[in-house]
Amino acid sequence: MKKQLAIGSLISLSLVAMVGCSQQATTTESAPAVVGIDPKIYTDSLFAVMKADRTNYTKLVVKRLGPAGADVIKPDEHWEDIENGTLLPAQMFRAGSEAVAEMTDDFTYSLQSLWPIGKQNGPKTPIEKAGLEYIAENPGENYYGEEKLGEVTYYTAVYPDVAVSDACTTCHNDHKDSPKTDFKLGEVMGGVVIRVPLAK
């Protein structure tokens, strides 16, 4: 737990340091003005926070409350329909994404898969499909590219979503709508797609 908090603090301090450096650079006359943060650094930093939150929710909350846990609050796909229900990790992730979309249009993110339980969570653009295929075939690597949607060019990054707990594999392998039922711990189950509009 202390290690997880230390990592979270390190990420927070790094982001503060980056912001502080950019502010300092814009106020120092001899230094060139900083236009913005590199999209790769931006998306990598966002993913680090998302991954930490998702992993901790899965391991520290859902795993402890599930069938082998306290059974006080019940993580369930249909959590709204049962007494003391709560969201599954993927649903919590989507709820966060929807809340962010209401606050800013500086970036969007979603959880997608080549083997989605819900069809709406499959790839919708060629770069999403290419990214999901790449991370599935190259474990531990990320995928980066640019795509034009409408009149806007986006920097799109796809990061592996790995089964961090048996709660992940059991849920997917046992689900009646899952197109893949042999996931193993540590395997790539899908990807986190982060999209950032690029300045014209």
Segments and roles (model prediction):
Residues 1-9:
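Bacterial N-terminal signal peptides that target proteins for export
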Residues 164-176:
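The canonical Cys-X-X-Cys-His
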Residues 18-20:
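C-terminal motif of bacterial Sec signal peptides marking the signal peptidase cleavage site
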